Swiss-Prot record:
The protein's name in its UniProt record: O-methyltransferase cnsE
Functional pathway: Alkaloid biosynthesis
Gene3D superfamilies documented for this protein: Vaccinia Virus protein VP39
Entry's EC annotation: 2.1.1.-
Chain sites annotated for binding S-adenosyl-L-methionine: Q110, D133, A134, H155
Length: 276
């Protein structure tokens, strides 16, 4: 019987699944609506107290800080933001840690917005944004002192290659922090995961399988924290925006809201790993 990792590789080679170009074009079309909904970010928020009402910007800021604490870059270090969106998290962590951060995205629209909103407002050379595919990184070996990926691996068909590429551009001893959706099971054997699979490609991986892929790519897993309960209130942000937008995008946001609200089998992991 094929292993889960072998199955993921087969999925990555299946031409019926979306390519990086497809994903980039989706974000070209939806980034404005998503950043408006998520307080300038393109990732969910982190609630310390899920019963407390907070703004999208506050909770988005907090999730970014959770990533930053785990990465803990030193002043002046060069960090890679894998899937930078429109650049808010990139600029935020560069400012907090006085680090140099390069953000990459496969959305041309996101590159333009990031450069306009943050690239020209930060100190010269502190942030840099470019169009690049994480599965084929255009950087030299050991170019970076650390990296993070917030809700970007979930879109990548060949996660093994992406993680190997990230490992290649990191210096030994550097950290990689991942914040992303994961499943408790390797296949959609529950109603919630089945609904997720209907509207998202590629399929989710389990946290265990993601850790195995990290080890195969040359990382040591340091910590895994499941924060599904802390991000669950994000469903209200999707619901509110979906109702206001209407149409196809509005309907998809409402479906995402429903899935997040019922995500007993749908996890959200903060994974800290070290390049060996």
């Amino acid at each position: 019987m094929a292993s889960e990792t072998e199955n993921l590789r087969a999925i990555a080679l299946d031409p019926s699944h979306p390519t990086p170009t497809d994903v980039g074009e989706i974000y070209d079309e939806t980034s404005d609506s998503l950043t408006d909904m998520l307080g300038g970010y393109i990732h969910v928020g982190y609630w310390e107290d899920p019963s407390k009402q907070e703004t999208a910007e506050v909770v988005g800021d907090r999730l970014t800080r959770e990533v930053g604490v785990r990465l803990s870059p030193a002043q002046g270090e060069h960090i890679l933001d894998v899937g930078c969106g429109t650049g808010k998290s990139t600029a935020q962590l560069a400012g907090i840690y006085d680090a140099q951060v390069t953000g990459i995205t496969i959305s041309k629209q996101q590159v333009e917005v990031a450069r306009s909103q943050y690239g020209r407002k930060m100190p010269a050379g502190q942030v840099h944004f470019q169009f690049a595919d994480a599965m084929d990184l255009p950087f030299g070996d050991a170019s970076f002192d650390g990296a993070y990926a917030i809700e970007s691996l979930v879109h990548m068909l060949d996660k093994r290659t992406a993680l190997a590429q990230i490992a290649q551009v990191l210096r030994p001893g550097s950290r990689l922090v991942i914040a992303d959706l994961v499943s408790d099971h390797p296949c959609p054997d529950s109603p919630v995961l089945a609904r997720y699979a209907e509207i998202f490609e590629p399929p989710l991986v389990s946290a265990d399988d993601l850790q195995n892929l990290l080890r195969q790519a040359g990382f040591k897993v340091i910590d895994v924290t499941d924060i599904r309960e802390n991000i669950r209130p994000s469903c209200k942000l999707f619901e509110t925006k979906g109702l206001s937008l209407g149409g196809e995008l509005g309907q998809k946001l409402l479906e995402i809201a429903s899935i997040l609200e019922e995500m007993n089998e749908l996890g959200y992991a903060l994974i800290t790993a070290e390049r060996l």
